[in-house]
UniProtKB/Swiss-Prot annotation:
It comes from the Bacteria. GO terms for cellular component: cytoplasm. The gene is sdhE. Pfam families: Sdh5 (PF03937). Transmembrane segments: none annotated. The keyword tRNA processing does not apply. One of its GO terms (biological process) is succinate metabolic process. Its main location: cytoplasm. An FAD assembly protein, which accelerates covalent attachment of the cofactor into other proteins. Plays an essential role in the assembly of succinate dehydrogenase (SDH, respiratory complex II), an enzyme complex that is a component of both the tricarboxylic acid cycle and the electron transport chain, and which couples the oxidation of succinate to fumarate with the reduction of ubiquinone (coenzyme Q) to ubiquinol. Required for flavinylation (covalent attachment of FAD) of the flavoprotein subunit SdhA of SDH and other flavinylated proteins as well. Keywords: Chaperone, Cytoplasm. This is FAD assembly factor SdhE. The keyword Disulfide bond does not apply. PANTHER family: FAD ASSEMBLY FACTOR SDHE (PTHR39585:SF1). It is found in: Cytoplasm.
């Protein structure tokens, strides 16, 4: 992944909720180079959803749509 694409994803991690900002920015900073192409696409897709949905999925309050389940689980389990 080139630097421009990394920067674009980092920018998309900036949300309207501080909790999401912290969680997503930490995840992408630590994991971006280890994600597969499919995981990167899923992560990019995940970031198109609204903040309340993202928060509910990442906190485990709700289950995301099937195509996002793997990346959401991956984010939940990253430290």
């Amino acid at each position: 992944m080139d630097n421009r694409e990394k920067s674009r994803l980092l920018w998309k991690c900036r949300r309207g909720m501080l909790e999401l900002d912290l969680l997503l920015q930490k995840f992408i900073a630590n994991e971006i180079d280890r994600l597969t192409e499919n995981q990167l696409k899923a992560f990019d897709n995940l970031l198109t959803h609204n903040d309340p949905s993202l928060y509910a999925w990442l906190m485990g309050h709700e289950e995301p749509e099937k195509e996002l389940l793997e990346i959401v689980s991956f984010i939940r389990n990253c430290d």
